[in-house]
Amino acid sequence: MSKSGNGNGDKVLYCSFCGKSQHEVKKLIAGPSVFVCDECVELCNDIIREETHETHEETEARLPTPKEISNFLDEYVIGQQHAKKVLSVAVYNHYKRLQHKSEDGVELGKSNILLIGPTGSGKTLLAQTLARILNVPFAMADATTLTEAGYVGEDVENIIQKLLQKCDYDVDKAQQGIVYIDEIDKISRKSDNPSITRDVSGEGVQQALLKLIEGTVASVPPQGGRKHPQQEFLQVDTSNILFICGGAFAGLDKVIRERSDKSSIGFSAQLKSKKSSNDEASKVLGQLESDDLIKYGLIPEFVGRLPVVTTLQELDEAALIDILTRPKNALTKQFQSLFKMEGSELEFRDEALIAIAKKALERKMGARGLRSILENILLDTMYDLPSLEGVNKIVIDESVVNGLSKPILIYEQDEKKSASGSKD
């Protein structure tokens, strides 16, 4: 749209949408027989952004089913099928409880989770992967660093601060997050009898965690912490935060055996004891009861706040080999991607994978030991490779894993020679 101006042949242009002249706006963009001003462009952008945000929120609101959660866990975590099933159902019920507030007056309790399993069995990875599929903030804490308020160490409220940091201090998001507390077995009290002296890193921490896990309004310093004391503390309601606690609980199988042995008396008790002593620890853990955890050193109130308990099996050689190769972000795939950036292909032979798994089993580190083994094997190659030219492939075999030889480097000219030789 245009209009004659001052009679000198100048034309005043107008926005085809809002009708404002070129003098009333900052910018007028021309199209085929139409004009649009910068204000209308900004308005259109706002409308599109708002609609996109609403669509995104609708997508996020859809809660995956337990089977979908378990299938997603399968992509990243090898084995532990029973633990995956228990976690999938518990997490689904927890977030379903948040989405559908009870209309019949029945209050649904929160089902926090306790994961029991040896080091490197996948406890932390399961919790991290759950947070990823649900697209909620996730924070990790180490129970061994926690102390009662007023003592040297981390207060339990610091856990909530970590969760807030993960979501840019959005309180609403944090209140629906997941917190994983590792090494929870390390805060077991030192004896069955309540101690007269303060146990600030054991029973004291359990007492401090009680309300936080059950649900309370925690006061957390805002962004910047104590540097700005005049700022008001953020109030975070923890009643909808899902707490997952994990620990190795070394020796718990002995506690279970002792209880089961006492269930019989006389000659039959001795027979049962002999039989149970030959059982694998993982099978014994399947008979776990709440009293066993209390006997181990967790206070009854704390055990009561963790109603969902599941055990993870110790990983065998086959599972460790699968962990090296099968998941989306498998360790071998990560290193292959790293070497690809240098223009080289990294190949692990089957016997090398078996040798790596055996080393991890010897170290009793489970899946956690795999990365350090691979780092040691590939250290020299990663050091030299950026300085070398024409290396097409690096091959890792059993002798390399056992330190008897160096990785096999295949150069570009070697491949060309072998290719021409095969033609002849």
UniProtKB/Swiss-Prot annotation:
Instruction: Write down the Pfam families for this protein, in alphabetical order.
Output: AAA_2 (PF07724), ClpB_D2-small (PF10431), zf-C4_ClpX (PF06689)
ClpX-type ZB domain segment(s): 1-56
User: What role does this protein play?
Assistant: ATP-dependent specificity component of the Clp protease. It directs the protease to specific substrates. Can perform chaperone functions in the absence of ClpP.
Which species?
Legionella pneumophila (strain Paris)
Query: What is said about its interaction partners and assembly?
Result: Component of the ClpX-ClpP complex. Forms a hexameric ring that, in the presence of ATP, binds to fourteen ClpP subunits assembled into a disk-like structure with a central cavity, resembling the structure of eukaryotic proteasomes.
The record ties this protein, via InterPro entries, to: AAA+_ATPase, ATP-dep_Clp_protease_ClpX, ATPase_AAA_core, Clp_ATPase_C, Clp_protease_ATP-bd_su_ClpX, ClpX_bact, P-loop_NTPase, Znf_CppX_C4
Keyword Iron attached: no
Q: What is this protein called?
A: ATP-dependent Clp protease ATP-binding subunit ClpX
Q: Which PANTHER family match?
A: ATP-DEPENDENT CLP PROTEASE ATP-BINDING SUBUNIT CLPX-LIKE, MITOCHONDRIAL, ATP-DEPENDENT CLP PROTEASE ATP-BINDING SUBUNIT CLPX-LIKE, MITOCHONDRIAL-RELATED
A molecular function annotated in GO for this UniProt entry is: zinc ion binding
Q: Which GO terms describe its biological process?
A: cell division; proteolysis involved in protein catabolic process
Q: Return the SUPFAM superfamilies for the record.
A: Glucocorticoid receptor-like (DNA-binding domain), P-loop containing nucleoside triphosphate hydrolases
Q: What's the family?
A: Belongs to the ClpX chaperone family.
The UniProt entry's GO CC annotations, sorted and at most eight, read:
HslUV protease complex
Which keywords has UniProt assigned to this entry?
ATP-binding, Chaperone, Metal-binding, Nucleotide-binding, Zinc
* Binding-site residues, ATP: P118, T119, G120, S121, G122, K123, T124, L125
Keyword Chaperone part of the UniProt annotation: yes
Q: Which residues form a coiled coil?
A: none
Record-listed Zn(2+) binding positions: C15, C18, C37, C40
SMART domains, alphabetically? AAA (SM00382), ClpB_D2-small (SM01086), zf-C4_ClpX (SM00994)
